[in-house]
């Protein structure tokens, strides 16, 4: 089967406001670093991670996904009724069943004719 008129028209993301840097973590671990004679900067050097971002406790992944989907839909300029599929990819879920993609589909206001696929680990 060949598909026609399929494309990624818009891309959106939502970043959490809370930022915790590797330096912040090392500051909390300073007594341990001093006791073990570890140089500052080791965490970023070993992980390659400069900063981490966190949503507030209790934030549901599907809520962030729905917010982001709405942004992407708006940026695309495509009418909601023209969407044929929603593919939701995430490591985290709101609950075991139904799939988080179902809630995102509903919250984004996509039509019932729009197929839903939830890709998770």
Write out the residue ranges for each language-model feature.
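Active-site nucleophile and cofactor-binding loops and adjacent substrate-binding regions
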Residues: 57-59, 115-121
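Compact, aliphatic and Gly/Pro-tolerant "microcore" segments centered on a short helix or tight beta-hairpin
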Residues: 104, 112-117
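Short Gly/Thr/Asp-enriched flexible loops that form oxyanion-binding sites at enzyme active sites
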Residues: 92-105
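Poly-acidic low-complexity segments
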Residues: 79, 99, 118-121
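Conserved "HGTGT" condensation-loop signature of ketosynthase/thiolase-family condensing enzymes
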Residues: 1-84, 105-110
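Short glycine-rich or small-residue beta-strand-to-loop segments that form or flank ligand, phosphate
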Residues: 85-91, 118
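N-terminal start-of-chain detector that recognizes signal peptides
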Residues: 58-59, 90-92
